[in-house]
Amino acid sequence: MKFANLIFASILITYLLPDEYAQADVVNVAVAANFTDATRDIVPLFEKTTGYNVKVSFGSTGKLYSQIKNGAPFEVFLAADKKRPEKAEHEKLAIKGTRFTYAKGKLALWSANAMLFTNGEEYLKTGNFKRAAMANPKTAPYGLAAQQVMKHIGIWKALHSRLVQGENIAQTFQFVATHNAQVGFVALSQVKAWKGNKGSFWEIPQNYYAPIAQQAVLLKKGEKNPAAKAFLEFLKSAQVKTVISRYGYGVN
């Protein structure tokens, strides 16, 4: 009976303790889908270096931001743009002075078919495909960049009816990898990380779309969590910048 009471007391204490004491050794991080592979390399390095643990949730930047606004327990936000972290500051969901650019995203046109094209821009202009994949431009910064590229080339209206939209850039990549779309606009980092056939890809000139400055910020829920602050600082380290560069991102 005493043992049962002890268990009950322990559970009660866990629930009564403020979050920063109950899980002070854990940081809850929301990460844009395009940064999935890099994050999976970075997290073990962080945990080994600091002794803290990390819980990660991946998704489109727009959907993650909506979850943050609705009270999701995220403490750090790694977005695929700077718009949402700025909004988080403005709406008092994030701590001012903690926001910074951790990576500069690059867009690629990719096909799982190695023989599909040698000149990506010319291939897009021919329209010689049934389906092209892109992320939702309303919620995914890489989707917005894809839209900008097509408008720059002058093919947005012509291709609009043949575009299939992924909820995020990870789903967009899967559409192409599984041949549900012949070609797709994806993050260059995904092509770099892909373990299968590299296929055909075109690294799209960066003057074809607005810069993709991917920013991180400390959220209000992580203000008193040392693990959250440590994670953000770790992102700025030379060790992490090497990982980020390896996946095809630009770094400061």
Predicted regions and their residues:
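Exported/periplasmic ABC-transporter solute-binding proteins
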Residues: 23-51, 55-58, 62-72, 79-82, ...
